[in-house]
């Protein structure tokens, strides 16, 4: 997966390198996570942007009230319907992706009966993974780039010492969490 992630990053970033100005969040930060998650899950490449748009709208909130944005509910329904269609395809024609693995997963319930995950369970999980995973990663990318643009010495240190990247990501997640509308409780 790492090789595919690197190739996807290069595919999205290479066209931007010769340009004097570009919107890194719109042209990379928002697209990259869905490309990776979409490939892992098994979304057709041509449908990933559409799913991302539905997800963005489904998760969007009014910053003043916290209420869902207009069209958010409908977008969430479209996203789930899309996932359900892919799941039905994978049950008929399995492929090498997470959707197929979940479609074929068996487990033993408390009565000892072997069961499969229900469509609702698979659709719910994949929709959550696609929406929440892409949103938080996109926001992390944006937050990190803004922070590092304001801290040139730190940016240079990370550039010079790439082994610090995992630690820097963890610290950026802690310092400027991508999910701002979730309550958190500090504990000892």
Task: Indicate residue ranges for each PLM-predicted region.
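Cytochrome P450
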Residues: 1-188
